[in-house]
């Protein structure tokens, strides 16, 4: 699959296009007098150096674009790459099965765990089927049902957050969107099993928080976490979505700032160029972090887990 380059990556895209052209010429005529292999190698090294230079100085808006990258790995990609024996569970047992939230039982290094995560789509039909990763109340109620099942069977819960926000449609509001989110916040704070949450892309508002109350909260290096999108913030404060880059900087949506504020525990490094450049390497790093987090939490009693989670929540907002 060819890479899609973002606006700020255009210098890299131009180099990669040259590399592709030279490679194509080399394949067509192996009897050329010039040594194309050496030139391709030189350009590849230059591309890596340029990528390092650009990614060493990314702004919040550029990171927001990376968090939304169409080729970025989604929940089911990480399930496939980092877990074994995944069995998906469906439905909230009340209304419907929301495809914007996926969940089920899997094994992490042989250990049974419950996985719950937002799921976006890549092609148009899949995007519509997944509602662009924006869950309705039935999605959050499905998530809660799976969490309660995990607690009953003493399984750790692992959540993956990647949503622009909860779906704001009339039907979702009529079916109790705010109640479903609020109930999840309350019930997650009371769970008697370890809960590890990881923001893998967009962490949008209450739609993210509804599966984001945990004992450990991680973010991938180029993910974001915020109460509103930069475009939404800009529309409110400056009456123009064009001010989104300014809003992104002001909001503090990136992982280093959130770790500084003690809202997250760990930042998981991404491969050079972002998780979509090497999903396998990203999944390996994510798996290692999850195993380390569970090892830390396994030594705690049920009461210790609940007390620590309570203290964590109560500390938010204090310097």
From Swiss-Prot:
It catalyses: N(6)-carboxybiotinyl-L-lysyl-[protein] + acetyl-CoA = N(6)-biotinyl-L-lysyl-[protein] + malonyl-CoA. Pfam families: ACCA (PF03255). One of its GO terms (cellular component) is acetyl-CoA carboxylase complex. Keywords: ATP-binding, Cytoplasm, Fatty acid biosynthesis, Fatty acid metabolism, Lipid biosynthesis, Lipid metabolism, Nucleotide-binding, Transferase. SUPFAM superfamilies: ClpP/crotonase (SSF52096). PROSITE patterns: COA_CT_CTER. The keyword Transmembrane helix does not apply. It comes from the Bacteria. It is an enzyme of class 2 (transferase). One of its GO terms (molecular function) is carboxyl- or carbamoyltransferase activity. Its EC number is 2.1.3.15. GO terms for biological process: fatty acid biosynthetic process; malonyl-CoA biosynthetic process. Its main location: cytoplasm. Residues 35-296 form the CoA carboxyltransferase C-terminal domain. Pathway: Lipid metabolism; malonyl-CoA biosynthesis; malonyl-CoA from acetyl-CoA: step 1/1. InterPro entries: Acetyl_CoA_COase_a_su, ClpP/crotonase-like_dom_sf, COA_CT_C. It is found in: Cytoplasm. Transmembrane segments: none annotated. Acetyl-CoA carboxylase is a heterohexamer composed of biotin carboxyl carrier protein (AccB), biotin carboxylase (AccC) and two subunits each of ACCase subunit alpha (AccA) and ACCase subunit beta (AccD). Belongs to the AccA family. Component of the acetyl coenzyme A carboxylase (ACC) complex. First, biotin carboxylase catalyzes the carboxylation of biotin on its carrier protein (BCCP) and then the CO(2) group is transferred by the carboxyltransferase to acetyl-CoA to form malonyl-CoA. This is Acetyl-coenzyme A carboxylase carboxyl transferase subunit alpha. It comes from Shigella boydii serotype 18 (strain CDC 3083-94 / BS512). The gene is accA.
């Amino acid at each position: 699959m060819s890479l899609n380059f973002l606006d700020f990556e255009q210098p890299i895209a131009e180099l990669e296009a040259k590399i592709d052209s030279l490679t194509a010429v080399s394949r067509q005529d192996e009897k050329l007098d010039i040594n194309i292999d050496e030139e391709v190698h030189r350009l590849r090294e230059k591309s890596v150096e340029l990528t390092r230079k650009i990614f060493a100085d990314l702004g919040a808006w550029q990171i927001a674009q990376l968090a939304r990258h169409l080729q970025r790995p989604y929940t089911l990609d990480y399930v496939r790459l980092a877990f074994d024996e995944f069995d998906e569970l469906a439905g909230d047992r009340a209304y419907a099965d929301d495809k914007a939230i996926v969940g089920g039982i899997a094994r992490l290094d042989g250990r049974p765990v419950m996985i719950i995560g937002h799921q976006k789509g890549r092609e148009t039909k899949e995007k519509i089927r997944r509602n662009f990763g924006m869950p309705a109340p039935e999605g959050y109620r499905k998530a809660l049902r799976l969490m309660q099942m995990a607690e009953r069977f003493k399984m750790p819960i692992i959540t993956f957050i990647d949503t622009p926000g909860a779906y704001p449609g009339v039907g979702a509001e009529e079916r109790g969107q705010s109640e479903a989110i609020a109930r999840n916040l309350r019930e997650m704070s009371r769970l008697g099993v370890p809960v590890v949450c990881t923001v893998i892309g967009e962490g949008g508002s209450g739609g993210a928080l509804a599966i984001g109350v945990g004992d450990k909260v991680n973010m991938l290096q180029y993910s974001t976490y915020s109460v509103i999108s930069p475009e939404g913030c800009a529309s409110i404060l400056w009456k123009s979505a064009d001010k989104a880059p300014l809003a992104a900087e002001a909001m503090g949506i990136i992982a280093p700032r959130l770790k500084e504020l003690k809202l997250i525990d760990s930042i998981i490094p991404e491969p050079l160029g972002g998780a979509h450049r090497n999903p396998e390497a990203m999944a390996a790093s994510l798996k290692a972090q999850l195993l380390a987090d569970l090892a830390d939490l396994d030594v705690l009693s049920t009461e210790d887990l609940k007390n620590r989670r309570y203290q964590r929540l109560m500390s938010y907002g204090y310097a």
